[in-house]
């Protein structure tokens, strides 16, 4: 008798990816976040689909339709806040996932790492467009400020911005196209995630020691399915706590005011997960420089594999690099805090210092430390 799980064309793919997949026996809970991101994406697609059934992408009715979802649709408020806070969970898992990749040297798996960077950009674009859809004050002004950054591109900038807007300012065409793109992008993200997994399974997972585990593997099921399920329960617990007890904790009160092009909010800021990049953007006084720094703040991840001369893949046995890694984390938290503050001293100077430190750590300090650690191996 043949085993359907191992011979059926479709089941075989699932089996080789989630059941009989040979896995290192020593990967920690930090490796759970890949599956948690998959769970977040599923939650976002399902809640988003139900929201799209009631939402209208029109400047005159968008705000009212969101109010209608919260007041009149059965459990509409739950779906709306699950979707909004689900995005926060998504980014929390993303940042930990990327941080784990940096700490344990997973960037050595180049194809997987580069697809991951593409995924990060796609998720950020999707979240930005989703924030515009409720058509509150922060939605409108956030869309205006961020899309306006493209005008810093020489020659074509202004035309490009007007092309994206579909007019001479953010309006109905902008909202309609943002809704269309916000709807389609998660499916593109799903496809990219599958390619991400495909490349990962070509080489196999990294592990905390950074050593080859080919001589000692265990099947993914039941060991890691159980472990991932525990992580999923904790994620759902946190998401439901946020949604049911503190639904507006991470939102902006300004977004409960309908969009008004004639009234600018005191200080425009994006959602918390973009604040670190926003702080880097604001720390540079001229527009083109700020835009370049903003893009480089994420794109710098692509050159990390070429800036790591260390003879050990992970930071597990490299205390100097560990110390610098946690300084980098503290620096990013500082940038996140600064991004939410008004543009005045001392916040300007703190933001500039933190931005310089961020790029210095990534490009100079950490690679130099790797060279010192290589020397220390010979002592």
UniProtKB/Swiss-Prot annotation:
Record: residues binding a ubiquinone: 201
One Pfam family from the record: Cytochrome_B
Gene Ontology, cellular component aspect: mitochondrial inner membrane; respiratory chain complex III
Cofactor(s) needed: heme b
TM ranges: 33-53, 77-98, 113-133, 178-198, 226-246, 288-308, 320-340, 347-367
Binding site for heme b b566: 97, 196
UniProt membrane topology term: Multi-pass membrane protein
Further details from the record: Heme 1 (or BL or b562) is low-potential and absorbs at about 562 nm, and heme 2 (or BH or b566) is high-potential and absorbs at about 566 nm.
Name used for this protein in its record: Cytochrome b
Native organism taxonomy: Eukaryota, Metazoa, Chordata, Craniata, Vertebrata
